[in-house]
Amino acid sequence: MIIMVLCIILFVTGLPGCRQAGQAGGTALVDLAVQHQPIVGFGACPAWSCPTMEVWMADVFYNVDSGIGMSLMRLRIAPDGISLEMEAAKKAVARGALVWAAPWSPPAEWKDNHDVNNGGHLLPEHRQDWADRLALFAADAAAQGVPMFGISPQNEPGYLPEPPLSWETCDYTPESLMEFVRDYLGPALAKRGLATKVIAPETDGWKTYDGFATALLSDTVAASYVGPIATHSYSGTPHLPEIVRRSGHQVWQTEYTDLNVNEDTGLESALKVATRIHDDLVQGNVSAWHHWQFIASEPYWYSGLMVGKELTPRGWIVGNWSRFVRPGFVRVEATASPQPGVLLSAFTDPPTGRLVLVLVNTMERDILQEVSVINGTMPDRFTVWVTSATLKLEQSGSIDVSRKGMFTVTLPARSVTTLVSVLPGASR
């Protein structure tokens, strides 16, 4: 009786609490005429876990037909200026990926704490030495067949939890990082004739991103060396600062994993990652999105995209974007959350008109979602690809689209669904 009365109250007041699984919520609008950021791709890092990356593994991560179709790889530069992941990078390049790299710490003897861990600062007398070493790394990588798209000056430059820290770190202020880029790293790359751009600041999260980005972009010389403005996504709310928007620099999200998974390699953690990808793309306007590691190392062995030789649901869910939202696509305007528990992002390929929609359903029930596509070439139909408790990025039928661009899709409980348009006149 109490439940019945509650449902009557919710019905009368228009609240969604007793909506049935088969009942559609608000219509999601996709406006092809309103374009946002270009997409460079999706990637991860092989550091400390899979430095050589076997051929089958490279295919799982980078093959667009049989794998999840990533298009970026982030390498670690060790304090001695080498990367143990160069063999993995060669396999990524062979599959069409862009490769870039980041250091976690300069050599201990070049820091004021004489330790690669536990923060510390790069000594002024070794700034040029470190910049030259990073530029040499980029040149050597290119000579080995791995053109270096970008070099980061420092992983998480302002992240200073209480020591002791068990990983490599080095501390910069926004001003000191800008000066290192402007006076040392940028000129060192240019001196070698490299097209390699600086990818910075790579802060630990959106919470600390603005100050570093503002320092880099407020100095015209430093800004001239910088390519993507980068951040990790461990803290804060994704957003696009006005100075970054005005600058025209792409925004890259360069590291995220669910660190609070409690050994959960299943759908619960995977949907957290899906929500983060959506928010970074839609609210943060990122052009590139990186998971932390392909295969996680201790102590977070369960937080990777792959455990053992199997992709986790987390890995397949990244593939709901990375396999279909290809480099060169552009995000277009869409209703980001058309009803409770549903997230939507939309992307188009300007040369072909292909449209890709990615919908996240975090609810415990199936949801019907109406979609209206306006202001562009309407697709005839969409193929449907689902990752859920039972499906691993598997095709699940198709949906016809009306002449007015309207259709309804069923989103399985706790799932990510990708809709890939079939172009007018195409056979499939």
Regions found by a protein language model. Give the residues of each.
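C-terminal beta-strand-rich structural cap/linker in extracellular carbohydrate-active enzymes
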Residues: I399-R428
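Carbohydrate-binding surface patches
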Residues: S337-D380, R414
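Structural recognition of the beta-strand scaffold that forms the well-ordered cores
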Residues: P38-P46, M70-I77, L98-P103, F149-P153, ...
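Aromatic/acidic polysaccharide-binding cleft in carbohydrate-active enzymes
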Residues: Q250-V325, V332-P340
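Bacterial Sec-dependent signal peptides at the C-terminal "C-region" and cleavage site
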Residues: L10-G25
